[in-house]
Amino acid sequence: MTLPEPLFRMEGISKRYGGAVALKDADIAIRPGAIHAVLGENGAGKSTLIKIMAGVVAPDEGRMLLDGKEIAFASPAAANAAGIVCVFQELSLIPDLSVADNIVISNPPLKFGMIDRRRQRRIAEEALARAGASDIHPSALVKDLPLSRRQMVEIAKALARKPRLMILDEATSALTQSDVEKVFTMLKRLRAEGMALIYISHRMHEIAQLADECTVFRNGRSIESYPAGTKTDQQVVELMIGREYSNVFPPKPAHRGEVMPVLSCRDLSWGDRLSGITFDIRPGEIIGVGGLDGQGQRELLLALFGVLRDVKGEVVIDGRPVTLKSPRDAKSGGISMALIPEDRKTEGLMLPMTVRENLSIAALDRVSRNGVIDRAAERREIDDLFKLLAIKAATIDMPVAALSGGNQQKVVIAKWLMNRPRIILLNDPTRGIDVGTKQEIYLLLRKLADAGAAIIFYSTDYDELIGCCDRVLVMYDGSIIRQLEGAEINEHELIGAALNIAGDHAAQRIAP
């Protein structure tokens, strides 16, 4: 079958930021009626590539062609006018405006010089329906929507612009499984309608399910383009990281013997979201928290960290009952707990501030003397963490917003490690980062556990739970219904427990 000519092509594209090369002689060709996956580690050049496509930044060298004619975009508005629209990983919605206002914000329908509210609502309803999100009310305020629904509004906003080429940058990373399926259905429909689509994701199974063509980027260069399905996952990952990809997860230690738990929960409950949570964790253990998304896993972490009010039940630290009324209590010296949040950009980092400031602010007591920051002590602490986490940054005084997503996530982790926590809570810490950085985080977690930390690790990725965790607590409807250990930690048992289906072992509430 003869392939159609590319709708959009980039040839020899290069971009530098100061002395740093973001793209070097990059090429890519996007065809109509096809989904083109762009793969690469964080920092490989993908974000710069799509920013150039979308008119956010201009290339230093190279050219772009649309319908065979050379073009240049002075702004995102110019790219939109040419039919190129991007759904960025960072949401562009205005929280205090309605869904409908956000969807038409770049080109509101007018009548007698004023916004035509009836037509605006109709446009919003059509865009939401096309995105598979007709359950979202156009009049709802964006700030009242959960993150996954905001992402669906972002996609609807892009569709309302009637693009010829739509770019999706990690568009499913914040979505529920139900919304992911709706997005997949939408993308397949748009492909059948002849739209050109660029799909960026670190989730290999999504690429396998959706893509027609793939291009791999590494260190700012386009390494190889190939038809989807012609390479194994391992071959693709090796193209992305430039080395052999094996031993993704570090080996698990042998049974450590009986050690007194560092943390115990007894019948922890909170409203209708948590019920009867009971478990122990010992120093050196990595305990996974699994189950379908939204079964109380995040609430469990927030309850342990003192964020939630009116939590019932008992938390015991080192055999002594404690009261966790606030994160300050959880972080205190006697408890020494840390929570790595889910959303690094809104909950984990202060993006306009420097890497140094983000790290130091979490541990002022450690790096201060008589109320004044000891710059030498601060530098020693930061240098140690940079080495431990292999953080890539030109300088610690650069804005943290300028780092790649993977390095931003490392800074979030480093920020909490500044206080040397004994108990580490992680809320889906590898969401939206590349496979190489994920592997580094897995190694770090095992290293921290081997040094005596107790780690509670919530993940929506079954492979992570299987590969990283010594035990897995599976949650359903706010309760722990199953504990998996050893050979039981496999995909079949995890899925069965997540769906509350009794497998070889009857589902039961866990008691230590």
Curated annotation (Swiss-Prot):
Record's GO cellular component terms: plasma membrane
Lineage: Bacteria, Pseudomonadati, Pseudomonadota, Alphaproteobacteria, Hyphomicrobiales
GO terms assigned for molecular function: ABC-type D-ribose transporter activity; ATP binding; ATP hydrolysis activity
InterPro entries in the record: AAA+_ATPase, ABC_carbohydrate_import_ATPase, ABC_transporter-like_ATP-bd, ABC_transporter-like_CS, P-loop_NTPase
Record-listed ATP binding positions: 40-47
Protein name: Ribose import ATP-binding protein RbsA 1
Assembly information from the UniProt record: The complex is composed of an ATP-binding protein (RbsA), two transmembrane proteins (RbsC) and a solute-binding protein (RbsB).
CDD domains referenced in this protein's UniProt entry, alphabetically: ABC_Carb_Monos_I, ABC_Carb_Monos_II
Catalytic activity: D-ribose(out) + ATP + H2O = D-ribose(in) + ADP + phosphate + H(+)
PANTHER family from the UniProt entry: CARBOHYDRATE TRANSPORT ATP-BINDING PROTEIN MG119-RELATED, GALACTOFURANOSE TRANSPORTER ATP-BINDING PROTEIN YTFR
Domain ABC transporter residues, every copy: 8-244, 254-502
Membrane topology classification: Peripheral membrane protein
Record SUPFAM superfamilies: P-loop containing nucleoside triphosphate hydrolases
